[in-house]
């Protein structure tokens, strides 16, 4: 029986010399690969290391001697002998390389030895695992420099004793192989890749004992920097030579191929796909170098060719050039400028050509010409330039310029484009035999909005559109109420509620008028009143409709009674309201039976002015112009135009030429009137009305602009309180840019008006600064 109490375990002391001869023999076997270690051999060597590291030394070695209490960690002598072994082994290995000649042989031998050495170092690291986990770890934690885990120690030895001597010829051989591959020769990519992997594996900081930290210093300094320099030199020489014997478009294809080849060299390095051999961190610098040499140095040539490609509509080549130049967005500036100028020129020329067919009076041709240019280059920007924002902006700028300034606007007025666009809308939305289907009409209206976006004077468009919409509504000539509402909705989305509020009120007035007609008929029935004619009205709110009051005019007695009855009805229904009749907008139908040889009757669709003249001939067959003027109280200028229309229609006849009528000229009812049609429309606008209408539009535009400018100034100053002249002008221009471009002198005049009205004042001592007066 053992006596109970404390027992002391005695540990065997292992002398390094006793185990080293067997251990070094095994290590040499690992590095020479004469035959593989058996499992039992591996475990025996591992045990030697373990026993040595765990033995208690009576005379502690190394830095362990400073510690007291408990067993000391042993390992420095073993570590030193391992380090010395590696140095000796590598020195002997280096002598074998001196006899090698030829780059490929050198690469083959170097990569073979590296892989073997790397594998052997891994095995040695496993054998010395206990040393790594204890003595090495403790030394590293205490900040001891130059101490590494055994695998890392092996790499440090390779780096210091073999790599430093061989890296230059090896790197030179690798670079030569890459150049040969660029020249179209087949190379052994795996050799290049293995060398690169060696450089990457050796890229650690020797001052950093953590093997996981990888700075790629060896790779960068000994390979990448030289590789990038060679790449730049190679492609600089090649690009100059290629461009001297090939077209620019062929060069673009060549550059595409070259960039893809370089991408393949670096793509998927970690995946070992067999095609790549450069480390992934080289991707960016390689890309930028190739782009600089292959693209940026030849931008001037590209710019010239870009214009040629635009002229020739070579969209595929344009796309290729864009995709290459766009690799660096800063290089696109000149291309965008060239595109803008090209579209501007093409648009201006297209409008100039269509003007030979009087496009100034043909809104459809004018607008379609603009749309054709926009469609062509919008498709180009979308497909060739990837809808790049900068190229979209170039398209927009160019379209804005040629739409607002071209031969049509210069020959007529700056407001001609919005006027013609409004007239084109009128063609689309007015009833005709050529009205498109709903889907096509919607597409056409969408195209209108494309052009509308570029119109600078949107207030001019609004005036003309409003006037034409008003006529469509009162004349009931709209092709579709839905289409009208759709167009107003599109304008509202683009310009806001205020822009379309009057247009929407017009629709409301037409709806209210339908109800009023029904109420008027009920009123007549309740009063037992009869109507001698079929009578209908539209009651329009004066602030929303772009019509002017009629000139003096004596309503025919046949119409006067109906007008009087409606006035009485409306006054009873809406006390205090006053109706002003727009006779120039009224129309009706007359039944005419004048032919002495047959009883055929004709229905004439006529204006109220025309009706007032024709109804005179129920009493007698001929009148002088003066007599008709006295009877109708129509202005002579207007009356003569009415008579000219009736004479051209052969309803009346005169011995005088229709273009030289005087107050004494006599006109007669043409009793032999014949026409194949039974319904004849003779309702034509008077030239004087059109002239007044045109002058009124421009007058109202200028007046409205002044009011808008003043309102903008007040809004800005109310918010800012104080503002200098330059900033106020700038903010006014910015606020109103979506409606029109105010002229600076007009803004200045509006500021003066507001000062007079005491909305603003100039600050004392700062005459260029204004303050808002609440």
Curated annotation (Swiss-Prot):
<dbReference type="InterPro" id="IPR045093">
    <property type="entry name" value="Cullin"/>
</dbReference>
<dbReference type="GO" id="GO:0070979">
    <property type="term" value="P:protein K11-linked ubiquitination"/>
</dbReference>
<dbReference type="GO" id="GO:0005829">
    <property type="term" value="C:cytosol"/>
</dbReference>
<keyword id="KW-0832">Ubl conjugation</keyword>
<dbReference type="GO" id="GO:0030163">
    <property type="term" value="P:protein catabolic process"/>
</dbReference>
<dbReference type="Pfam" id="PF10557">
    <property type="entry name" value="Cullin_Nedd8"/>
</dbReference>
<feature type="domain" description="Cullin neddylation">
    <location>
        <begin position="704"/>
        <end position="764"/>
    </location>
</feature>
<dbReference type="InterPro" id="IPR036317">
    <property type="entry name" value="Cullin_homology_sf"/>
</dbReference>
<dbReference type="InterPro" id="IPR019559">
    <property type="entry name" value="Cullin_neddylation_domain"/>
</dbReference>
<keyword id="KW-0963">Cytoplasm</keyword>
<comment type="pathway">
    <text>Protein modification; protein ubiquitination.</text>
</comment>
<dbReference type="GO" id="GO:0051898">
    <property type="term" value="P:negative regulation of phosphatidylinositol 3-kinase/protein kinase B signal transduction"/>
</dbReference>
<feature type="cross-link" description="Glycyl lysine isopeptide (Lys-Gly) (interchain with G-Cter in NEDD8)">
    <location>
        <position position="718"/>
    </location>
</feature>
<dbReference type="GO" id="GO:0019005">
    <property type="term" value="C:SCF ubiquitin ligase complex"/>
</dbReference>
<dbReference type="GO" id="GO:0032436">
    <property type="term" value="P:positive regulation of proteasomal ubiquitin-dependent protein catabolic process"/>
</dbReference>
<dbReference type="GO" id="GO:0016567">
    <property type="term" value="P:protein ubiquitination"/>
</dbReference>
<dbReference type="GO" id="GO:0031146">
    <property type="term" value="P:SCF-dependent proteasomal ubiquitin-dependent protein catabolic process"/>
</dbReference>
<dbReference type="GO" id="GO:0043066">
    <property type="term" value="P:negative regulation of apoptotic process"/>
</dbReference>
<dbReference type="GO" id="GO:0160072">
    <property type="term" value="F:ubiquitin ligase complex scaffold activity"/>
</dbReference>
<keyword id="KW-1017">Isopeptide bond</keyword>
<dbReference type="InterPro" id="IPR036390">
    <property type="entry name" value="WH_DNA-bd_sf"/>
</dbReference>
<dbReference type="InterPro" id="IPR016157">
    <property type="entry name" value="Cullin_CS"/>
</dbReference>
<dbReference type="GO" id="GO:0031625">
    <property type="term" value="F:ubiquitin protein ligase binding"/>
</dbReference>
<comment type="subunit">
    <text>Component of SCF E3 ubiquitin-protein ligase complexes consisting of Skpa, Cul1, Roc1a and an F-box protein. In larval neuroblast self renewal and asymmetric division, as well as ddaC dendrite and mushroom body axon pruning, the complex contains the F-box protein slmb (SCF-slmb). In caspase activation during sperm differentiation, the complex contains the F-box protein ntc. Interacts directly with Roc1a. Interacts with Fsn. Interacts with Dlish. Interacts with Cad99C (via the cytoplasmic domain). Interacts with Sans.</text>
</comment>
<dbReference type="GO" id="GO:0035331">
    <property type="term" value="P:negative regulation of hippo signaling"/>
</dbReference>
<keyword id="KW-0833">Ubl conjugation pathway</keyword>
<dbReference type="GO" id="GO:0005634">
    <property type="term" value="C:nucleus"/>
</dbReference>
<comment type="function">
    <text>Core component of multiple SCF (SKP1-CUL1-F-box protein) E3 ubiquitin-protein ligase complexes which mediate the ubiquitination of proteins involved in cell cycle progression, signal transduction and transcription. In the SCF complex, serves as a rigid scaffold that organizes the SKP1-F-box protein and RBX1 subunits. May contribute to catalysis through positioning of the substrate and the ubiquitin-conjugating enzyme.</text>
</comment>
<dbReference type="InterPro" id="IPR016159">
    <property type="entry name" value="Cullin_repeat-like_dom_sf"/>
</dbReference>
<dbReference type="InterPro" id="IPR001373">
    <property type="entry name" value="Cullin_N"/>
</dbReference>
<dbReference type="Pfam" id="PF00888">
    <property type="entry name" value="Cullin"/>
</dbReference>
<dbReference type="GO" id="GO:1904801">
    <property type="term" value="P:positive regulation of neuron remodeling"/>
</dbReference>
<dbReference type="InterPro" id="IPR016158">
    <property type="entry name" value="Cullin_homology"/>
</dbReference>
<dbReference type="GO" id="GO:0031398">
    <property type="term" value="P:positive regulation of protein ubiquitination"/>
</dbReference>
<dbReference type="GO" id="GO:0002785">
    <property type="term" value="P:negative regulation of antimicrobial peptide production"/>
</dbReference>
<dbReference type="GO" id="GO:1905088">
    <property type="term" value="P:positive regulation of synaptonemal complex assembly"/>
</dbReference>
<protein>
    <recommendedName>
        <fullName>Cullin homolog 1</fullName>
    </recommendedName>
</protein>
<dbReference type="GO" id="GO:0030674">
    <property type="term" value="F:protein-macromolecule adaptor activity"/>
</dbReference>
<comment type="similarity">
    <text>Belongs to the cullin family.</text>
</comment>
<dbReference type="InterPro" id="IPR036388">
    <property type="entry name" value="WH-like_DNA-bd_sf"/>
</dbReference>
<dbReference type="GO" id="GO:0045879">
    <property type="term" value="P:negative regulation of smoothened signaling pathway"/>
</dbReference>
<dbReference type="GO" id="GO:0046627">
    <property type="term" value="P:negative regulation of insulin receptor signaling pathway"/>
</dbReference>
